[in-house]
From Swiss-Prot:
Keywords: Cytoplasm, Inositol biosynthesis, Isomerase, Lipid biosynthesis, Lipid metabolism, NAD, Phospholipid biosynthesis, Phospholipid metabolism, Phosphoprotein
Catalytic activity, EC: 5.5.1.4
Listed name of the protein: Inositol-3-phosphate synthase
Annotated Gene Ontology cellular component terms: cytoplasm
Protein encoded by which gene: Inos
Organism: Drosophila melanogaster
C-alpha cells in the first residue's frame, strides 16, 4: 500500500506548527461586512478574525459504500481503482493507454503556491497540499437492486475498453453488491427488469438492514472510516409536508409508520447518519428533506450533494459566469441532451426527468443575481432543459446548448456548443474527489485564536465545500448558494492553503505591476520550501518554455507576450 501522508511541502513560517498529530496554523481571516443605510448608501466594514486552523495528519483507512454499486458509475469507479492500483496498460486504436485519474481535481490538477526566484509561478498537485487518502488504499463495497457481480456489471455498462475489461474482469467478478432497496414508486417502471437483488420488509426493516450492512463492512474490511455515496437511479421528488418530514422527529416517525413518501435514498441517508458515516447524494432528487438535514445537524454527521456536476452543467456554470462578469446579458439558454445508458433510460420517465430538470435549471441563479445592472429583481434568462433517451449512443451523452445574449445598443450574440461527454468517465473522477475531500473535511477544525478556552469547531454538517462537484449544491440554512465554478474551486484551494498557513490567492501580483525595488530589499516571494523530490513544474518568463498554467498536458508552450498567458 502506498504511503498516505503524501504532503511534500514545508511552509517556513512562525505561524505554522507541525507535530505528529496536527498541522496547526495561525490564520487571519479577512472579510467585509456591508451595511445599507436608509438613504441607500453602502457602508463596507473590513473585518479580520484571528483563527487557529488545525488539520489531522493521520489519514484513515477509508471504505466507500456505493448505493448503485453495479451501475455504470459504480462499476467504472471500481474498475478504475483496480486499473490504477495495478498501473495497467492496454492497446487502443491510437496506441497504448495507461490508467489515470484525469478529471479528478485531487489527483490530476494543480494549485498555485507562490513565485520562485525568477518570478515564475510554482504549482503543485492538489493532493500534495495536505495528507489525503490515496486512491489505491480505498476499499469499495455497496448495494444494488441488480445482483450481477461487478465483472458482469462492468461489461453491461459498456464504458471501458474491452482490452482493459479483460485484464480486470476476474478481480471484479469476486465482488457482488449487497441487496438494495427497490421502490417502483420512486424510479421509472422500466427499471423493474433489473430488480432481482432487493431488501424485503417495511421501511424500518430496510433501514435496520442498511445499518447492519455498514457495520458488517466496517468489521470485515477493517476500515477506520466509511463514506456512503448514492450513485443509483434518479428518484422522483418526495413530498415535503408538515407532520411527514419537516423535522427529524417527524421523519423518524414516518419511517417507523412505513409512510410511502420516505424514499429509498432518504432511508440510506438516515442509516448512514445513524452509523456516523458521511452521506453524499450524487443524484438530483430531494433526498435531503428538512427533517433529514436536521437529523444530520443533531448527530453532527456530514451530508453533501446534490447531483454530480460533470459535463454540460459544468460548462454552463463557467460560461454564464464569464458572460455576466463581462457585462453581457444572457437572455435565453436552451439545453438539449440525449444519451443511451441506464441513467437516460430512467430519466425517460416524466417524474424522474423533473428531478433532473430542477437540478440543471438552477445553476445560473447566483450569477444572474450578482449583476443588477443587467437584471431587475425578478428578471432571469429563459432557461429550458430537454433530455431524451437514445439507446444506441450508450454512455456517450450528447449535449447541445444555445446561449443568446444581449450586447451593446440592442445587439445580440449567440453561442452554440456541441459537447460529447462519456458520461461515466466524467462522473467517476468526481466520486473519487467527493470521498477524498469529504474525508479530509472530517480532519479540519478551527477556533478563535484570541481565546485559549475556545473550542475547536468542525465544518457544519451540510458540507458546502463540495459544491464544486455538485449541480445543485446543498448549503447550510441561511447560506448563499454559489454555482459559479470559479468561486467554488477558489473556495477549495484557499481553504486548503489556509490549512498550511498560506494566504488566499488574490491574483494581485503587485510585485509584477509595481517596481518593488523602491519598496523593499527583499524579493517578493512566498517562503515555501519543497522537500523530497520536487514537483516537475517549469516556469514561463520572457519566451522560455513552461508548464506554469496549472496543467500538465505534455506540451510546453512558448510565451509570446508579457502577461503570462
Amino acid at each position: 500500500m502506498k504511503p498516505t501522508n503524501n504532503s511534500t511541502l514545508e511552509v517556513i513560517s512562525p505561524k505554522v506548527q507541525v507535530d505528529d498529530e496536527f498541522i496547526t496554523t495561525d490564520y487571519d481571516y479577512q472579510t467585509s461586512h456591508v451595511k445599507r443605510t436608509a438613504d441607500g448608501q453602502l457602508q463596507v466594514h473590513p473585518q479580520t478574525t484571528s483563527l487557529k486552523i488545525r488539520t489531522g495528519r493521520h489519514v484513515p483507512k477509508l471504505g466507500v459504500m456505493l448505493v448503485g454499486w453495479g451501475g455504470n458509475n459504480g462499476s467504472t469507479l471500481t474498475a478504475a481503482l483496480e486499473a490504477n492500483r495495478r498501473q495497467l496498460k492496454w492497446r487502443k486504436r491510437t496506441g497504448v493507454q495507461e490508467a489515470n485519474w484525469y478529471g479528478s481535481i485531487t489527483q490530476a490538477s494543480t494549485v498555485f503556491i507562490g513565485s520562485d526566484e525568477d518570478g515564475g509561478d510554482v504549482y503543485v498537485p492538489m493532493k500534495e497540499l495536505l495528507p489525503m487518502v490515496e486512491p489505491d488504499n480505498i476499499i469499495v463495497d455497496g448495494w444494488d437492486i441488480s445482483g450481477l457481480h461487478l465483472g458482469d456489471a462492468m461489461r453491461r455498462a459498456e464504458v471501458l475498453d474491452v482490452a482493459l475489461q479483460d485484464q480486470i474482469y476476474d478481480q471484479l467478478a469476486q465482488l457482488r453488491p449487497r441487496p438494495s432497496i427497490y421502490d417502483p414508486d420512486f424510479i421509472a417502471a422500466n427499471q423493474s427488469d433489473r430488480a432481482d437483488n432487493v431488501i424485503r420488509g417495511t421501511r424500518l426493516e430496510q433501514y435496520e438492514q442498511i445499518r447492519k450492512d455498514i457495520r458488517d463492512f466496517r468489521e470485515r474490511s477493517g476500515v477506520d472510516s466509511v463514506i456512503v455515496l448514492w450513485t443509483a437511479n434518479t428518484e422522483r421528488f418526495a413530498d415535503v409536508q408538515p407532520g411527514l418530514n419537516t423535522t427529524s422527529q417527524e421523519l423518524i416517525a414516518s419511517l417507523e409508520a412505513n409512510h410511502s413518501e420516505v424514499s429509498p435514498s432518504t432511508i440510506f441517508a438516515m442509516a448512514s447518519i445513524a452509523e456516523g458515516c458521511t452521506y453524499i447524494n450524487g443524484s438530483p432528487q430531494n433526498t435531503f428533506v428538512p427533517g433529514l438535514i436536521q437529523l444530520a445537524e443533531e448527530k453532527n454527521v456530514f451530508i453533501a450533494g446534490d447531483d454530480f456536476k460533470s459535463g454540460q452543467t459544468k460548462i454552463k456554470s463557467v460560461l454564464v459566469d464569464f458572460l455576466v462578469g463581462a457585462g453581457i446579458k444572457p437572455v435565453s439558454i436552451a439545453s438539449y441532451n440525449h444519451l443511451g445508458n441506464n441513467d437516460g433510460k430512467n430519466l425517460s420517465a416524466p417524474q424522474q426527468f423533473r428531478s433532473k430538470e430542477i437540478s440543471k435549471s438552477n445553476v445560473v441563479d447566483d450569477m444572474v443575481a450578482s449583476n443588477r445592472l443587467l437584471y431587475g429583481p425578478d428578471e432571469h434568462p429563459d432557461h429550458v432543459v430537454v433530455i431524451k433517451y437514445v439507446p444506441y449512443v450508450g454512455d456517450s451523452k450528447r449535449a447541445m446548448d444555445e446561449y443568446t445574449s444581449e450586447i451593446m445598443m440592442g445587439g445580440h450574440n449567440t453561442l452554440v456548443i456541441h459537447n460529447t461527454c462519456e458520461d461515466s468517465l466524467l462522473a467517476t473522477p468526481l466520486i473519487l474527489d467527493l470521498v477524498i475531500l469529504g474525508e479530509l473535511s472530517t480532519r479540519i477544525q478551527l477556533r478563535n485564536a484570541e481565546k485559549e478556552s475556545a473550542p475547536w469547531v468542525p465544518f457544519k454538517p451540510v458540507l458546502s465545500l463540495l459544491s464544486y462537484l455538485c449541480k445543485a449544491p446543498l448549503v447550510p440554512q441561511g447560506s448563499q448558494v454559489v454555482n459559479s465554478l470559479f468561486r467554488q474551486r477558489a473556495a477549495i484551494e484557499n481553504i486548503l492553503r489556509g490549512c498550511i498557513g498560506l494566504p488566499p490567492i488574490s491574483h494581485m501580483t503587485l510585485e509584477q505591476r509595481f517596481d518593488f525595488s523602491t519598496i523593499t530589499n527583499e524579493p517578493p516571494l512566498k517562503r515555501v520550501k519543497i522537500l523530497g523530490q520536487p514537483c516537475s513544474v517549469e516556469s514561463v518568463t520572457n519566451g522560455k518554455k513552461l508548464h506554469a498554467n496549472g496543467h500538465s498536458n505534455g506540451s510546453a508552450k512558448l510565451a509570446t507576450n508579457g502577461n503570462g498567458h
